[in-house]
Amino acid sequence: MISDTNTYPVGAGMPAKRPAGTASSAMPIRGLARSHRVRVNLGLCALAAAITLAGCAGLPDQRLANEAMKRGDTALAERNYKALADLGYSEAQVGLADIKVATRDPSQIKEAEATYRAAAATSPRAQARLGRLLVAKPDSTQAEREEAETLLKQAAKQGQSNTLIPLAMLYLSYPQSFPKVNAQQQIDQWRAAGNPEAGLAQVLLYRTQGTYDQHLGEVEKICKAALNSTDICYVELATVYQKRGQADQQAALLGQLKAAYARGAVPATRVDSVARVLADRSLGQTDEKTAKDLLEQVAPANPASWVSLAQLVYDFPELGDTDQLMAYIDKGREAEQPRAELLLGRLYYEGKTLPADAQKAEQHLQAAAEAGEISAHYYLGQLYRRGYLGNVEPQKAVDHLLAAARGGQNSADYALAQLFSEGHGIRPQPGNAWVFAQLSQANPTPQSAELLQQLDQQLTPDQRNQAQQLLDQEKRARGSLAQGANSTLALEALQDDEKEVDGEDSL
């Protein structure tokens, strides 16, 4: 087991009723007719009043909620969705659950799962949402994975989009749960059948297998063909051109993107994603000025882009001073963006742009972690591992670093290897250190490779066998989507398809 006290399990997983009236049988026919009209009018008035109390005529409320969601006004959307959801409208229940999922708060996501499940009996959209949510659920059970497969297949048969990529993710994440399914063969069948999502499922497989760079030509071909119907392809094509250094093709793509955004065919979130590709040093030569222009264009309509702008200025200080950086962060925090809390906590943690303040760093990082920001767990773990708050707190460090590592942050594995190797606040545990040093080799650095070599020399054959068992256990706990699960394509696959028919059409 992996713990500062030898008790921490590595592979265990992360933790109206219409009023009735009666007529006298002795009433004359003319009076009966008049009475009937009165009762009908009263009944209609009562029904209208009930609907008004619920939120102002059902259909306009649903439309208002949908429009508010597109604007990012989740408070208004939630009020209107709830009014209709309380009346039993399944599509409004779906909208309400979508808002809960978007918070990334574990308790809210749990409520969303229950809401989707309640609506799934009558709503194919709810089936698709629930299936996607179960695919993304940490430490899902075998029963939940099988349920996700069933739901996504049912939703696909009923015409719901954005179902095949989550299915592909399910098969790639948990091959042991679906031993009869070969992901590549399944994708080949989908492509042969002409399913429009199948090409993107193939792209996801390349990302997952770490062979994306070897298939840039096919990725380009797939996404060029799907660009008009699947706007996530703007991100994939931008990535391809960035990796190849094809400035002319990138400029042409950005022109298409701007035109599509101007006519409302592409959401602001997609523009934000492309801007982040342009500013990603790991993809090749950056174009941070164009990235800033794109983000400034969409930030008023997409509050998350204020944080993207802050991150851009942080990464490229020549684009703005500290006042500009903090102004962007403040706008992000005003919009309750967890990434803003993460970046502010990181600034206090590093002590470069702002004076170092471990207490403030902990406060903001904790807020970000509670909202689902995986990187916040990494920095919290380092705070506790290094004793920045006054004392080394090894168990807190293990908890947060393990959460970060299992969430896909590779640097957390190296930090865990250091923790168990150095033994600050705990006795050294070279077997545990070896496990995480091995896991850190998914994206090796000279430092992690050197540490692994040192640990290799320290372990006895028995210790090596025990450590290998723990390593296998931890790998099973994490699944096999280490390289692909955090890609934009994968994340989008688990979220709502913005091109789906608005919910009021189903009411």
Q: Would you name each region that the model predicts?
A:
Residues 72-76, 104-115, 140-151, 175-186, ...:
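Structural signature of tandem alpha-helical TPR/SEL1-like repeats
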Residues 57-59:
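Bacterial signal peptide processing site
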Residues 446-507:
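Terminal, low-structured helical/coil segments at or just beyond the last alpha-helical repeat
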